[in-house]
Amino acid sequence: MRELRERPLGAGLRVAIVAARYNEMLVGHMIEGAREALLEAGVKDDDILLVRVPGAFEIPAVARRLADTGQLHAVVALAVVLRGETYHFQVVADACAEGLQQVALQGKVGIGFGVLTVDTVEQGLARAGLKQNKGEEAARTALEMARLLTAI
């Protein structure tokens, strides 16, 4: 009997994880979650590139540059933006989201948006690994979008 099997979602794909160094404890959990999800999906470890940037604000510029190389299929963006006492939180969160949306609209790579905007460290912990891991979710989304963009 012949069996048709779908190849793993990540097989043959090259993926970058662009992660902020700010809020390292939380982002570190997300990086591990993203990496594990990519490996489980069939992405080879050698096909995963980790790029660290200072903070969330810097992610879109690096994601755009990576997309423009034509060497990657997907970019997973990871950061935690923690609300403070000033408007800075909103500026950084909005700039990061808008910048990544612009990269996504280019249609060159699948984008996984794993940028958490939280009010407290506890909320960050819950979303970065204790109860769920948004890094894993962002990685799976990036792979799905990469496959979809390739198929169109």
What are the language-model segments listed below?
Residues 2-4, 89, 94-152:
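C-terminal binding/interaction regions
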Residues 3-54:
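Glycine-rich phosphate/diphosphate-binding loop of Rossmann-like nucleotide-binding domains
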Residues 16, 49, 73-77, 109-115:
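Structural motif
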Residues 21-22, 53, 79-81, 115-120:
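Short, ordered loop/turn segments at secondary-structure junctions
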Residues 24, 36-44, 64-71, 101-105, ...:
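Generic secondary-structure signature for well-ordered alpha-helical cores
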Residues 35, 39-40, 47-71, 87, ...:
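Amphipathic alpha-helical hairpins
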